[in-house]
């Protein structure tokens, strides 16, 4: 289901991934807003983006974030900035609780193909 209002696009379709899922909440030429849910023990690939930076706000759970080989621990109401071209990943190390992140992407392109994977536990690295 898509609802269009001026340049914003609101989507209610849940996109499934091996680590969990995401929903695109809003998109314009200047930003893309996602709600990301990482299942218990889920791990996103160690990746970078050429055309976008990301702001992650932790909504629920505890995130272990690897940013350029440095580890950060973030909980609800905390945030981190991921500059474009920075290598990064997030892990949900909980055995039972989900991790929920609001991601704000800024940059010149917001494409799922703008992912360079360096490692991935689900076999998706190139």
What is the predicted role of each segment?
Residues 12-16, 89-126:
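Double-stranded beta-helix
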Residues 51-64, 68-69:
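Glycine- and acidic-residue-biased ligand/ion/polar-headgroup-sensing regions
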Residues 69-87:
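Short acidic-glycine-tyrosine-enriched beta hairpin
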Residues 37:
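Short proline/glycine- and basic residue-enriched helix-capping loop/turn segments at helix->loop/beta transitions
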Residues 1-34, 43-46, 115-126:
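A short, N-terminal "cap"/entry segment at the start of jelly-roll beta-barrel domains
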Residues 42, 51-52, 70, 86-87, ...:
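A generic "binding-loop/recognition-motif" signal
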């Amino acid at each position: 289901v898509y609802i269009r209002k001026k340049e914003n696009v609101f989507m209610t379709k849940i996109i499934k991934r091996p680590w969990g899922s995401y929903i695109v909440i809003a998109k314009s030429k200047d930003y893309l807003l996602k709600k990301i849910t990482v299942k218990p023990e889920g791990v996103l690939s160690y990746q970078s983006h050429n055309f976008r930076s990301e702001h992650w706000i932790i909504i629920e759970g505890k995130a272990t974030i690897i940013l350029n080989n440095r580890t950060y621990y973030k909980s609800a109401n905390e945030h981190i900035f991921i500059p474009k071209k920075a290598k990064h990943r997030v892990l949900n190390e909980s055995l039972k609780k989900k991790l929920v992140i609001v991601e704000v992407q800024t940059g010149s392109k917001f494409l799922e193909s703008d992912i360079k994977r360096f490692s991935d536990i689900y076999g998706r690295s190139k």
